[in-house]
């Protein structure tokens, strides 16, 4: 066995067309295309959800850091006011 040559592939293709018919193959192609389109859409939506969740996590971490910094500066300001008294 040498492998698949172009003539063998053509013979197999012709047999498939004769076996299933062009209308069945056209329907199969349309179904396959719709499935691929749905898969790509789902992957794109999954990426958008992951990005938004990652962004929210990053924003909450930044908010927490800002709140901690403000609390620390407020406590330092209160301590300096107590020292002045």
Curated annotation (Swiss-Prot):
One of its GO terms (cellular component) is TAT protein transport complex. GO terms for biological process: protein transport by the Tat complex. Residues 64-85 are annotated as: Disordered. Keywords: Cell inner membrane, Cell membrane, Membrane, Protein transport, Translocation, Transmembrane, Transmembrane helix, Transport. The chain crosses the membrane at residues 1-21. Its main location: membrane. Pfam families: TatA_B_E. It is found in: Cell inner membrane. It is a single-pass membrane protein. One of its GO terms (molecular function) is protein transmembrane transporter activity. InterPro entries: TatA/B/E, TatA/E, TatE. The keyword Cell membrane applies. Belongs to the TatA/E family. TatE subfamily. Part of the twin-arginine translocation (Tat) system that transports large folded proteins containing a characteristic twin-arginine motif in their signal peptide across membranes. TatE shares overlapping functions with TatA. This is Probable Sec-independent protein translocase protein TatE. It comes from Yersinia pestis. The gene is tatE.
């Amino acid at each position: 066995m040498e492998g698949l040559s172009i003539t063998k592939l053509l013979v197999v293709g012709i047999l498939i067309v004769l076996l299933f018919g062009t209308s069945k193959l056209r329907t199969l192609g349309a179904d396959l295309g719709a499935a691929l389109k749905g898969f790509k859409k789902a992957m794109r939506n999954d990426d958008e959800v992951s990005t938004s969740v990652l962004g929210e996590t990053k924003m909450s971490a930044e908010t927490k850091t800002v709140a901690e910094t403000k609390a620390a500066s407020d406590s330092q300001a209160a301590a300096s006011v107590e020292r002045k008294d």
